[in-house]
């Protein structure tokens, strides 16, 4: 039994969270290992592994314009395009590990590149780029008009809006955040054939033009305490529909974020905290 450990690779990691959205953060800059889908699934198990919503992998960048390359894997081992809360945690990880010594970090990703800035109030700002309402940015099986999209679920049409924040989001406006059918509708939309690669589903209640409440059902994960890209998506839709101003507080189950967007042709900014929980190592 114990001899098996000699055959395994020891890797060091940090457990972190952004407003309750929790991560296992690993760097492959100073250590060498191979991650497979099954390994990630085992690591994500909250009873027998580390347990997390997503695994964040930091790699060397092949482009001199960027400090590092950043990859995101859901708990089921699937690689995804974007994670706003994760980006803030990656920034804090790089700072705590002494891998960076400047206030602004440039990260390349598999889809959209992002920049991270450390603020004077211990918050972290992420430039999430301009939201996209273009069909080609969202994997969908039929042509639709994005701001007038409805899908038939449970014998009724559900009105929602679609937007990409580097990853696909469906935003639904609700009257009650507590009574929103997050799990029921989230599962139905995620598995709907109209979204062949799945979809993140946000349920947004508008309090006023500067304040919303939000719950998010994340693709491959389920409802989480917080979703940074989901907050960006909800605010982008709200601003595009003239429901919100350009500076919005977003209340999530795990805390709040500030989202700023001046509108089309401008980048969107997310501001919030990141927390380091503990460091550890595990054999894979």
Curated annotation (Swiss-Prot):
UniProt site positions, description: Could be important to modulate the pK values of the two catalytic cysteine residues: 169, 218
Binding site for substrate: 21, 54, 74, 84-85, 167, 200, 218-219, 228-229
GO-annotated molecular function: diaminopimelate epimerase activity
Record keywords, A-Z: Amino-acid biosynthesis, Cytoplasm, Isomerase, Lysine biosynthesis
Gene3D superfamilies to which the protein is assigned, alphabetical: Diaminopimelate Epimerase, Chain A, domain 1
GO biological process, one term: lysine biosynthetic process via diaminopimelate
Enzyme class: isomerase
Residues of the site described as Important for dimerization: 278
Record field: catalytic activity: (2S,6S)-2,6-diaminopimelate = meso-2,6-diaminopimelate
Role, per record: Catalyzes the stereoinversion of LL-2,6-diaminopimelate (L,L-DAP) to meso-diaminopimelate (meso-DAP), a precursor of L-lysine and an essential component of the bacterial peptidoglycan.
Protein name according to UniProt: Diaminopimelate epimerase
Organism annotation: Buchnera aphidicola subsp. Schizaphis graminum (strain Sg)
């Amino acid at each position: 039994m114990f001899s098996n450990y000699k055959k395994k690779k020891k890797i060091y990691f940090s457990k972190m969270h952004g407003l309750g959205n929790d991560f296992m953060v690993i760097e492959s800059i100073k250590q060498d290992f191979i991650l497979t889908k099954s390994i990630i699934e085992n690591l994500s198990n909250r009873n027998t592994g580390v347990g997390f919503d997503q695994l964040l992998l930091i790699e060397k960048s092949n482009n001199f314009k960027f400090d590092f390359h950043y990859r995101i894997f859901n708990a089921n081992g699937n690689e995804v395009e974007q994670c706003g809360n994760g980006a803030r945690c990656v920034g804090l990880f790089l700072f705590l590990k002494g891998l960076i010594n400047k206030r602004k970090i440039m990260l390349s990703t598999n889809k959209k590149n992002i920049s991270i800035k450390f603020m004077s109030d211990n918050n972290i700002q992420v430039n999430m780029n301009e939201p996209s309402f273009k069909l080609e940015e969202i994997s969908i099986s039929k042509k639709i008009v994005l701001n007038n999209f409805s899908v038939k679920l449970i014998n009724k049409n559900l009105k929602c809006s679609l937007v990409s924040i580097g990853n696909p989001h469906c935003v639904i406006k609700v009257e009650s955040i507590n009574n929103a059918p997050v799990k029921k509708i989230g599962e139905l939309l995620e598995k709907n054939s109209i979204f062949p690669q799945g979809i993140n589903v946000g349920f947004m209640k508008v309090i006023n033009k500067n304040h919303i409440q939000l719950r998010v059902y994340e693709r491959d994960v389920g409802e989480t305490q917080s979703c940074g890209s989901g907050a960006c998506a909800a605010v982008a839709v709200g601003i595009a529909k003239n429901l919100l101003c350009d500076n919005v507080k977003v209340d999530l189950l795990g805390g709040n974020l500030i989202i700023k967007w001046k509108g089309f042709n401008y980048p969107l900014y997310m501001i919030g905290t990141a927390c380091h929980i503990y460091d550890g190592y595990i054999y894979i």
